[in-house]
């Protein structure tokens, strides 16, 4: 009798876990794309401003105050002379011009308090001597060295009164104010040596360069075209580094040409330690594949792969990587596309991290019609000028944002919304300044 054996059960492979996404993604259009503004707002909603720190007042210039700063006492705390001149009691001048002049003798060795009817020499910023309440300029002296007056002098003329700027407890600086040298001087005059501000965000740029095989191919073709020696530069990373430094943040750049996913993952994790934002750039083009950074992000934390209604830069990648949920944004390949995404998304992120409000929009009128894309926001390099007192834009070169020559001739990048009809002459467009 034949023996029938039960077939061995083959275990089905476990399905791969879905990549961890990020919550609250905005709605999309019929093509599954977000608008540029919605995507920007979404990214900014995922980050918080850098925690405030106490900074010495002179070093806080350009930073945003994180609390109201109150005067600890009257500012100024004492009454001082505003000008170099002579201090005296204004009451001794009340008869000047009724009908004749009044002469005030200058006391060369002033007593304390000053004798009524006399004046003493003072310097700007010095305390008013006891018994005086005004300061007169030296051009009122006659040939004998006495002060000659033909009209009474008002009390506190030429003086800066104690508490005349701020009284004790008054607000010197409001929360959110950007500190400039004038505000710094007020804080210092009030005796405040430290202020709570948001520090400049720490940004790490991870530049993924062409790998050795791609580099060798580039050099081979360059030699065939007569270029014996070409510098190994990354134009995308250079453009983004310069744009980031222009925003007055702390920038570190890390370059790599690794082809190893594990090495790149380790590099990104190290970049995130101590950073407030990681920006990934790449000049490595692999047709039909994700850029090298995007492919390693899902295991590192929540990742958002989005399609945005914009050209260039339709594919956008953002992640919050461990440890610490550090924001990381991946920029498209190429200086122009990367700059567009930087202006559209990275700059607002950095302002949010810095505790600053959104940047004011610069508008300029078109000098001629500009073509639109029917479904996507596009971007045009432009030059700016003032015509009749109004800002006017004109296309730089061929107006191709992917062309570095056009970018080099531009002052700004104009944002052209989608539409079936060209932008008419004279219509204002939002512009992002390049410098």
Where are these regions (language model features)?
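Phosphate-binding glycine-rich loops and their immediate beta-loop-alpha structural context
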Residues: 158-281
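Flexible glycine/proline-rich
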Residues: 53, 57-58, 67, 80, ...
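Phosphate-interaction motifs
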Residues: 2-193
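Solvent-exposed alpha-helices and their adjacent loops that cap or buttress functional pockets
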Residues: 79-81, 94-98, 111-115, 128-129, ...
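Short Gly/Thr/Asp-enriched flexible loops that form oxyanion-binding sites at enzyme active sites
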Residues: 280, 287-301
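Short glycine-rich anion-binding loops that position phosphate/pyrophosphate groups of nucleotides
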Residues: 93, 125-126, 210-211, 283-290, ...
């Amino acid at each position: 009798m034949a023996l029938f054996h039960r077939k061995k059960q083959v275990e089905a492979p476990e399905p791969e876990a879905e990549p961890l996404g990020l919550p609250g993604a905005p709605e999309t259009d019929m093509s599954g794309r977000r608008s540029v503004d919605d995507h920007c707002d979404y990214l900014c909603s995922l980050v918080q401003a850098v925690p405030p720190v106490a900074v010495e007042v002179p070093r806080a210039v350009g930073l945003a105050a994180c609390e109201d700063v109150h005067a600890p006492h009257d500012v100024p705390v004492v009454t001082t002379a505003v000008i170099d001149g002579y201090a005296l009691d204004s009451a001794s001048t009340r008869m000047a011009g009724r009908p004749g002049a009044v002469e005030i003798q200058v006391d060369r060795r002033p007593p304390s308090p000053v004798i009524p009817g006399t004046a003493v020499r003072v310097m700007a910023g010095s305390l008013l001597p006891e018994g005086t309440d005004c300061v007169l300029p030296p051009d009122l002296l006659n040939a004998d060295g006495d002060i000659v007056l033909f009209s009474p002098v008002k009390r506190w003329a030429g003086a800066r009164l104690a508490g005349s700027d701020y009284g004790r407890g008054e607000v010197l600086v409001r929360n959110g104010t950007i500190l400039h040298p004038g505000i710094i001087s007020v804080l210092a005059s009030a005796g405040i040596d430290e202020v709570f501000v948001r520090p400049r965000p720490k940004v790490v740029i991870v530049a993924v360069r062409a790998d050795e095989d791609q580099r060798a191919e580039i050099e081979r073709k360059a030699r065939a075209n007569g270029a014996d020696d070409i510098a190994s530069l990354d134009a995308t990373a250079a453009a983004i580094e310069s744009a980031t430094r222009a925003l007055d943040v702390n920038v570190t750049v890390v370059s790599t040409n690794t082809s190893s996913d594990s090495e790149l993952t380790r590099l990104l994790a190290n970049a995130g330690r101590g950073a407030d934002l990681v920006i990934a750039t790449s000049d490595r083009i692999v047709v039909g594949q994700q850029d090298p950074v995007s492919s390693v992000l899902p295991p590192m934390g929540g990742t958002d792969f989005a399609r945005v209604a914009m050209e260039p830069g339709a594919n956008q990648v953002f992640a919050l990587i461990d440890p610490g949920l550090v924001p990381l944004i991946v920029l498209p390949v190429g200086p122009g596309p990367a700059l567009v995404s930087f202006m559209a998304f990275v700059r607002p992120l950095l302002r949010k991290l810095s505790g600053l409000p959104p940047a004011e929009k610069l508008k300029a009128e078109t000098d001629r019609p500009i073509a639109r894309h029917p479904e996507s926001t596009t971007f045009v390099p432009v030059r700016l000028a003032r015509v009749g007192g109004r800002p006017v834009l004109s296309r730089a070169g061929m107006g191709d944002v992917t062309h570095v020559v056009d970018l080099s001739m531009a002052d700004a990048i104009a944002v052209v919304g989608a539409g079936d009809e060209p932008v008419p002459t004279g219509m204002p467009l939002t512009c992002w300044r390049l410098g």
